[in-house]
């Protein structure tokens, strides 16, 4: 957004596997619907996810609520306009649009149709399904086959995956703004906080401004949306500067080559 403030303007954004009552992705885009100039926000939930087992106000207050389907079917939520007349489009305007025919798996026909409708896909997919495995299409390939823009979380190890690396090599996708040396921290539920504080601080969690935040060290962003960090100049040292101030290198060159200059090779 800092690089291109209009990146989401007039766009339909799909958040698959993101229940709006529990997903910070949905909350974030709902809160910034007007600022980003979104056309439509679509969120789906997966029936077998932990958050899906809890009823949301959006679902309970809807005439479409069905207790049996709640436990077995994925759900569809949409946000398009100021439904409550508050003068602003926000999370209170999210509409429960009904149950999916299946469990909400991203590979299903109905979620794939939502993918095709969307301009941009953003989510935190199951890391175990990031790439194709055992003949089942992976999440990244599912997006790329539709030629969609995306921002998704994944494990750093996916960089070396035979299905992922070629896309990085061809500059078709790239890593997000976060440096690989930086950890990610997430807001977590109260129950999860209690579980975390039994672990060692720094390994599983970190207290930031008095709040217990879950830590994820091995995650990074994958995207094909341009961002400013890709255009920042690399600060590279010069050979002359390195020879002048690198005492260890000077000592090695003098010992092995009898002079303090870089050796030249003809190969």
Where are these regions (language model features)?
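Class I S-adenosyl-L-methionine-dependent methyltransferase catalytic core
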Residues: 1-267
């Amino acid at each position: 957004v800092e690089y291109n403030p209009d990146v989401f303007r007039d766009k339909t954004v799909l958040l698959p596997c993101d229940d709006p009552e529990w997903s910070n992705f949905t909350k974030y885009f709902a809160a910034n619907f007007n600022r980003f100039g979104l056309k439509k926000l679509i969120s789906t939930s997966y029936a077998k996810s932990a958050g899906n087992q809890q009823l949301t106000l959006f679902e309970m207050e809807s005439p479409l609520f069905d207790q049996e389907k709640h436990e077995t079917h994925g759900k569809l939520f949409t946000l398009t306009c100021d439904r409550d007349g508050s003068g602003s489009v926000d999370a209170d305007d999210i509409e429960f649009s009904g149950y999916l025919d299946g469990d909400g798996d991203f590979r299903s026909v109905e979620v794939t149709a939502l993918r095709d409708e969307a301009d941009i896909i953003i989510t935190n997919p199951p890391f175990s399904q990031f790439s194709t495995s055992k003949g089942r299409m992976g999440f990244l390939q599912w997006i790329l086959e539709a030629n969609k823009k995306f921002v998704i979380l994944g494990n750093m190890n996916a960089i070396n995956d035979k299905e992922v690396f070629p896309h990085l090599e061809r500059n078709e996708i790239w890593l997000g703004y976060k440096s690989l040396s930086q950890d990610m921290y997430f807001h977590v539920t109260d129950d999860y906080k209690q579980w975390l504080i039994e672990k060692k601080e720094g390994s599983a969690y970190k207290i930031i401004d008095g709040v217990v935040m879950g830590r994820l060290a091995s995650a990074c962003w994958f995207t094909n949306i341009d961002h400013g960090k890709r255009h920042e100049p690399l600060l590279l040292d010069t050979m002359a500067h390195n020879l002048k101030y690198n005492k260890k290198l000077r000592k090695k060159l003098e010992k092995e080559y009898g002079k303090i200059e870089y050796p030249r090779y003809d190969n």
